[in-house]
């Protein structure tokens, strides 16, 4: 994973990357990472999120069948805005200020589904996320081609980006990858990899997981069923 992550990091220009068993698995692992950070105790408690940041804000027009992967972590989706433009009743959709207004001390992340019709514009949502210190997860599963999108969302300020490996990349259908902030990729990896090892003997690649910042190793994480 560390070697593959280095390749993903190079092609996406993100801090780090990680191979997953599809974009939905990337959504699940990314959400878990945003909820727990690098806290093994929180990792062990998922999907019980009592006492944690356990809400993910999503524009109402971004809801889709795949957001079940987000909810599977144990978080609640907080829908904001009204998508009048899709109902034919008007021209408005969710606006960035509505996302900001929904942020509380329970907000773990903001979910954003990238496509040509997505609203509000990603840059506006990134401004909100950075102002409030809330990570944004971009689902870019079907946003290839163009190849430039491999770098676009990270360059715009997304904390995590999920891609499918089974569409235009033409890899196995059960493949994908997650890229973004190094600390969040590490948190995702910790909840995905086999943890059946003694902490004192465990020697993960530091480029993927910095053992020195951990009080101990978590148990098998919520993402273990998504192993590759």
Segments from the language model and where they lie:
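A glycine-/small-polar-enriched, mobile loop at the entrance of the PLP active site in fold-type I
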Residues: 1-2
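Conserved PLP-enzyme active-site core in the AAT-like
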Residues: 5, 13-19, 23-228
């Amino acid at each position: 994973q560390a070697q593959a992550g280095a390749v993903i990091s190079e092609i996406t220009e993100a801090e780090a990357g990680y191979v997953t068993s599809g974009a939905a698995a990337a959504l699940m692992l990314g959400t878990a990472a945003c909820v727990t950070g690098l806290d093994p105790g929180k990792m062990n408690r998922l999907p019980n999120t009592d006492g944690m940041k356990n809400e993910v804000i999503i524009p109402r027009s971004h809801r889709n069948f795949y957001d079940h992967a987000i909810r599977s972590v144990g978080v609640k989706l907080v829908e904001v805005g009204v998508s009048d433009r899709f109902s034919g009743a008007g021209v408005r959709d969710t606006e960035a200020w509505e996302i900001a207004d929904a942020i509380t001390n329970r907000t773990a992340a903001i979910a954003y589904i990238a496509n040509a019709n997505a609203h509000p514009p990603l840059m506006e949502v990134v401004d909100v996320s950075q102002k409030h210190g809330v990570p944004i997860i971009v689902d870019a599963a079907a946003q290839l081609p163009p190849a430039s999108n491999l770098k676009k969302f990270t360059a715009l300020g997304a904390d995590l980006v999920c891609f499918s490996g089974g569409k235009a990349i033409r890899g196995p259908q059960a493949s994908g990858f997650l890229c973004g902030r190094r600390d969040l990729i590490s948190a995702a990896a910790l909840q995905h990899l086999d943890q059946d090892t003694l902490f004192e003997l465990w020697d993960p690649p530091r480029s993927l997981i910095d053992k020195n910042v951990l009080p101990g190793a978590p148990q098998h994480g919520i993402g273990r069923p998504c192993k590759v």
